[in-house]
Amino acid sequence: MKRNILAVVIPALLVAGTANAAEIFNKDGNKLDLYGKVDVRHQFADKRSSEDGDDSYARIGIKGETQISDQLTGFGRWEYNVKAKGTEAAVAESSTRLAFAGLKFANYGSLDYGRNYGVNYDVNAWTDVLPIFGGDAMAQTDNFMTGRSTGLLTYRNTDFFGLVDGLNFALQYQGQNSDRTKNKGRDTERSNGDGYGLSSTYDVGYGITVGGSYANSARTADQKEKVSDAYGKRAEAWNIGAKYDANNVYLAAMYGETRNMTRYTRTIADTDATLIANKTQNIELTAQYLFSDLGLKPSLAYVQSKGKDLTEGKGFNGDLVKYVSVGTYYYFNKNLSTYVDYKINLLKKDNELGVNARNVFGVGLTYQF
């Protein structure tokens, strides 16, 4: 009996992180769902890598909908994350991951504004499914439209106005976030000028989906003048990808490039400095298989980001990220799971950029609702 339940529940959990959210209100066209998880985790690594030790956190979110008419629906979502690795006396490492609201117009799509995922992540999300690591070749939080970011106005359309099944697209505008705006105080590397982006995915059938995205933004004055050797006026990113998800097999691939955008840490005179790469070429490959009767899902992935023209002479290329991830999930039931993940770093320990090249092993337990 337990095996039959797992065979049904586990695929549902893999579709979305809020698959088993608790419905706390549903009346007169108003609906409110609560979801969250507690993820207790410990990582083992060389002490010099700064990746050894506890990395536990808790996360909670609310999703709401209100039916305005038979053609118009309002919606909103808020998600908050709290790190649990510090002391009670320390300032809590907490942050708002998502906070947006909008309107959905039947088959004409939805329009929302707030803190949300950038359109470049629509494709990158397919490979960002590893137990601990992954998704870091190109996507970065508060880095234009490659990951979660602030000030995003997003239009999304499903099934191309109801005319083509499986053809989805999104258009996005991002307002400036810098010392010149109301939310000033952020690092130069996490600032952005006005920009736009678009993405499209198509469900071909037979478990196959393909997609791509493009984003182009103005850079702030500080980014052009003070950070690394990326002096271009515009920041650009694009990616293409594909995934296969059927018969308990999951395969995904993503290739993308960025210009004047990607943050990386480099050791200069024994001091770590955060810089912006002039150009990066990024690849992520993921393979997983779900043994649904056992509740076991092994995972294998390859992740690489190669920086191009990183020095003043514009002639030095070097890997910013390069590793293999070997791990697995084990699902006790729909609410409780455990996992292990081993990051085999393929960077040379004496690489010229001084990028962290240590292996990391992590293990954790997750309760989600």
Swiss-Prot record:
Localisation per UniProt entry: Cell outer membrane
GO function term, MF aspect, one: porin activity
One Pfam family cited in the UniProt record for this chain: Porin_1
InterPro entries in the cross-refs: Gram-neg_bact_OMP, Gram_neg_porin_domain, Porin_dom_sf, Porin_gammaproteobac, Porin_Gram-ve, Porin_Gram-ve_CS
GO process terms (BP): monoatomic ion transmembrane transport
Signal peptide: 1-21
GO cellular component terms, A-Z: cell outer membrane; pore complex
Membrane topology designation: Multi-pass membrane protein
TM regions (residue ranges): 22-27, 29-44, 56-68, 71-83, 98-106, 109-115, 151-157, 166-177, 194-204, 207-219, 235-246, 248-259, 279-291, 295-308, 321-332, 335-344, 360-369
Extracellular side: 45-55, 84-97, 116-150, 178-193, 220-234, 260-278, 309-320, 345-359
UniProt keyword annotations, A-Z: Cell outer membrane, Ion transport, Membrane, Porin, Signal, Transmembrane, Transmembrane beta strand, Transport
Source superkingdom: Bacteria
Residues exposed to the Periplasmic side: 28, 69-70, 107-108, 158-165, 205-206, 247, 292-294, 333-334
Chain's role: Forms pores that allow passive diffusion of small molecules across the outer membrane.
Subunit note: Homotrimer.
UniProt record similarity statement: Belongs to the Gram-negative porin family.
PANTHER family: OUTER MEMBRANE PORIN N-RELATED, PROTEIN YDDL-RELATED
Protein name: Outer membrane porin F
Organism: Xenorhabdus nematophila (strain ATCC 19061 / DSM 3370 / CCUG 14189 / LMG 1036 / NCIMB 9965 / AN6)
Phylogenetic placement of the source organism: Bacteria, Pseudomonadati, Pseudomonadota, Gammaproteobacteria, Enterobacterales
Protein's gene: ompF
